[in-house]
């Protein structure tokens, strides 16, 4: 009997032990599940926050470009025959448009349902669909120059994201810094100083530091000429001929100019611009457009400068006005904006005088004035120079460049101006 009682006690003890282990295991499993759930919600919260910041940055960049369009429309369109008027404080005007969609308190139609405040509300609604309550307060919003082709928009935000299940919460105050490209937008300086008729789209020059190239140095004469070149000794009429030897070639003066290595036995007097260089055909193997400066003894490639000027591309400028300055109708970079960036914020383009002429509105084209935009539109009149080759372009031979702010060196035309 004692053995039976002892056996019963042992069985009860084993049963209780097993039961306890099962309870403990279930408790541990439940606790681990809870930990995993919390970890998942925290990770979801962090991912939500990162995605929210990305969305705020993207929306801020899109909205800023729309705000610039609204501001531009107010400085480019005249009313009742009056010339357009510049803005007073361009940075503050853009900040108002971005945040509230108004200009001096007046709603701008283009900003309807497109303000930063509106999109913040939309983002808050989207986070709720993912199980989070978010609250975003805009403390401040600033617009500054970043460099010559970008603006910097800084939105200081209070962000609170709360898990709707009460598991996790995040509270932060951050600055969303959005760098906004100006490319593809219109330059306000053009309409402001052409009674609203002129325009120019901002496109960064692809030729920075590579406007002209010196290809050959040699002996020559007979002034200079610009035109298409050729290595074809059978068809060089009205072209710049590049050849190794003049022997046997007739009608040399039918060419625009001649670049050759050896005169050979040809005794025909050359009346067109020419240059002699013993490696000419090697150094110029193809047939680009060339500026042959016979009297200067040099051959240049200047097509980059020509294309740049024809398209009125934009270049960084130490003294030219920034985009914000241009919205205010200024001809130089103001200290209030220059002090806000460590980069060059001024810009300049070459005015396409032919485009101004055909814009209409009886706008007077200043043929002898420099093509540098902020000087061209101003009352400043520094000495302006012609550039060899560009004075022979058809139909616009009126390209001029001043040497204010070192423009001759900047555009590599020091040996080409006169």
Regions found by a protein language model. Name each.
Residues 121-418:
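Long, compositionally biased low-complexity segments
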Residues 17-43:
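Transmembrane signal-anchor/signal-peptide helices with a preference for the extracytoplasmic
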Residues 64-140:
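Post-signal peptide N-terminal segment of secreted/secretory-pathway proteins
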Residues 1-15:
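Glycine-centered recognition micro-motifs in short, flexible terminal segments and loops
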Residues 36-69:
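Membrane-proximal N-terminal amphipathic helix
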């Amino acid at each position: 009997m004692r053995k039976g009682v002892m056996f019963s006690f042992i069985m009860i003890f084993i049963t209780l032990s097993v039961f306890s282990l099962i309870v403990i295991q279930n408790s541990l499993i439940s606790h681990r599940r809870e930990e995993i759930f919390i970890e998942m919600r925290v990770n979801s919260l962090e991912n939500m926050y990162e995605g929210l910041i990305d969305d705020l940055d993207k929306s801020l960049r899109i909205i800023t470009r729309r705000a610039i369009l609204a501001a531009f429309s107010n400085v480019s369109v005249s009313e009742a025959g009056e010339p357009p008027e510049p803005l007073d404080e361009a940075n503050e005007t853009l900040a108002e448009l971005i945040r509230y969609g108004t200009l001096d308190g007046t709603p701008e139609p283009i900003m309807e349902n497109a303000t930063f405040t509106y999109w913040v509300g939309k983002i808050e609604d989207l986070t709720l669909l993912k199980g989070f309550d978010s609250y975003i307060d805009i403390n401040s919003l600033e617009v500054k120059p970043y460099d010559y082709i970008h603006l910097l928009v800084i939105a200081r935000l209070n962000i609170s994201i709360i898990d709707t299940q009460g598991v996790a919460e995040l509270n932060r105050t951050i600055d969303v810094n959005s760098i906004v490209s100006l490319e593809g937008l219109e330059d306000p300086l053009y309409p402001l100083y052409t009674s609203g008729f002129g325009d120019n789209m901002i496109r960064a020059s692809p030729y920075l530091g590579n406007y002209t190239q010196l290809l050959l140095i040699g002996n020559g004469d007979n002034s200079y000429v610009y035109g298409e070149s050729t290595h074809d000794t059978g068809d060089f009429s009205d072209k710049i001929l590049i050849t190794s030897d003049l022997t046997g070639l007739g009608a040399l003066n039918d060419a625009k100019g001649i670049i050759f290595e050896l005169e050979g036995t040809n005794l025909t007097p050359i009346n067109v611009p020419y240059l002699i260089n013993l490696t000419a055909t090697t150094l110029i193997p193809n047939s680009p457009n060339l500026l042959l400066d016979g009297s200067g003894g040099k051959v240049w490639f200047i097509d980059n400068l020509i294309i740049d000027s024809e398209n009125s591309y934009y270049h960084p400028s130490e003294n030219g006005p920034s985009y914000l300055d241009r919205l205010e109708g200024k001809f130089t970079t103001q200290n209030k904006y220059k002090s806000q960036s460590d980069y060059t914020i001024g810009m300049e383009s070459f005015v396409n005088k032919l485009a101004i002429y055909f814009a209409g509105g009886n706008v007077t084209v200043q043929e002898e004035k420099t093509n540098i935009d902020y000087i061209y539109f101003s009352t400043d009149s520094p000495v302006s120079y012609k550039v060899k080759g560009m004075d022979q372009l058809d139909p616009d031979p009126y390209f001029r460049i001043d040497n204010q702010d070192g423009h001759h060196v900047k555009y590599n035309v020091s040996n080409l101006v006169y």
